[in-house]
Amino acid sequence: MYGIEYTTILIFLTSITLLNYILKSITRIMDYIIYRFLLIVVVLATMINAQNYGVNLPITGSMDTAYANSTQSEPFLTSTLCLYYPVEASNEIADTEWKDTLSQLFLTKGWPTGSVYFKEYTDIAAFSVEPQLYCDYNLVLMKYDSTQELDMSELADLILNEWLCNPMDITLYYYQQTDEANKWISMGSSCTVKVCPLNTQTLGIGCLITNPDTFETVATTEKLVITDVVDGVNHKLNVTTATCTIRNCKKLGPRENVAIIQVGGANVLDITADPTTAPQTERMMRINWKKWWQVFYTVVDYVNQIIQTMSKRSRSLNSSAFYYRV
C-alpha cells in the first residue's frame, strides 16, 4: 500500500517539475521572440521614412481645407513659412550668410529657427510654370516689371485662388465655358493658344475649323495663360501641346495661405477686376522698391500682420495641386 502511495506522490511531483520546466521554456521562447521583434522594429524605424498620403476627393470638395488662424494668441511654434524671392535679390545681396541673418531676425518675431524657408526662383515666367507652395504660410515677393504686368496678374490669379481642373482633349472635342468662374489654364515652356468660336451648326465664326491659321490668337509663346472666352459658345482650340498643357478649370475660391508682396510699381496689381474674384487686396500688397536688404527687413517687420490676413492650411501643396482632377 505504502509503495503505491509513494509512487503516486513521485509521479505527481515529477509532473509538476516537468510542467514547470515546460512553462519556463515557453516563457524563454516568448521572451526571445518578443525581444527579437522589438529589435527588428527599432532597427527598421531608423531606416524607413514615413509618408502620409491624401485621399481622393469628390468634385465639389477641395484638397485645401482651411484651419482656424492660430496666430492670434500663440507664437508660430508649429507653423512653417516659405518666402519666395527672385534670384536677383540674392545676387544683389551677395552674402553667403544672408539667409542665416534673416532667420535670426524672424526669430525675434516669434518664428523659430528652421521654421522659415527661403525659396529662390529665376523669374516670373519660370515661377508660373511650377509654383510650389509647400508651407503652412507662403509669401511671394514679385518685383514689378511693366513688361511682365500681364504675367504677374495671371500668376497672382492662379496662386491666390483654388482651382478644380480636368484634362482637355482638344483634338477630339469642342469646348465651351459655362460661366465666369470657368477658365482654361495653360502651362508649359511655350504656350500659344488659338480659339475658333462655333455657331450652332459647328461652323467657325470668322474662322475655318480646318485651318488653325484663321483662328483667333489669345496667347503667344507664354508660360502661363488663363483664357477667358464667351460663355455658352463652343470653341475649337489649337494649342502647342508639345510644349504646353491645357486644362478646363473652375475657380473655387480664395487660397488663403498665400499672399503676394509686390515690390515697387505705382499701384498694386488688381486682380479683383475679374468678376469671379472676391475682393482680397489684403493678400495682395505692395512695398516701395528699395535695396533688397530693405525689402526683406520690411517683410520681417510686418510678417505677423501679414499672417493675420491668411489662414493656415492642413497640408503643403506642390504645383500639381493646382490641377484638381475629377
UniProtKB/Swiss-Prot annotation:
Calcium-binding protein that interacts with rotavirus cell receptors once the initial attachment by VP4 has been achieved. Rotavirus attachment and entry into the host cell probably involves multiple sequential contacts between the outer capsid proteins VP4 and VP7, and the cell receptors. Following entry into the host cell, low intracellular or intravesicular Ca(2+) concentration probably causes the calcium-stabilized VP7 trimers to dissociate from the virion. This step is probably necessary for the membrane-disrupting entry step and the release of VP4, which is locked onto the virion by VP7. Keywords: Calcium, Capsid protein, Disulfide bond, Glycoprotein, Host endoplasmic reticulum, Host-virus interaction, Metal-binding, Outer capsid protein, Signal, T=13 icosahedral capsid protein, Virion. It is found in: Virion; Host endoplasmic reticulum lumen. Ca(2+) 2 binds at residues 177, 228-229, 231, 301. Transmembrane segments: none annotated. Glycans are attached at residues 69, 238, 318. InterPro entries: VP7, VP7_1, VP7_2. Ca(2+) 1 binds at residues 95, 206, 214, 216. This is Outer capsid glycoprotein VP7. GO terms for cellular component: host cell endoplasmic reticulum lumen; T=13 icosahedral viral capsid; viral outer capsid. N-glycosylated. Residues 1-50 form the signal peptide. GO terms for molecular function: metal ion binding. Disulfide bonds join 82-135, 165-249, 191-244, 196-207. It comes from Rotavirus A (strain RVA/Cow/United Kingdom/UK/1975/G6P7[5]) (RV-A). The keyword Signal applies.
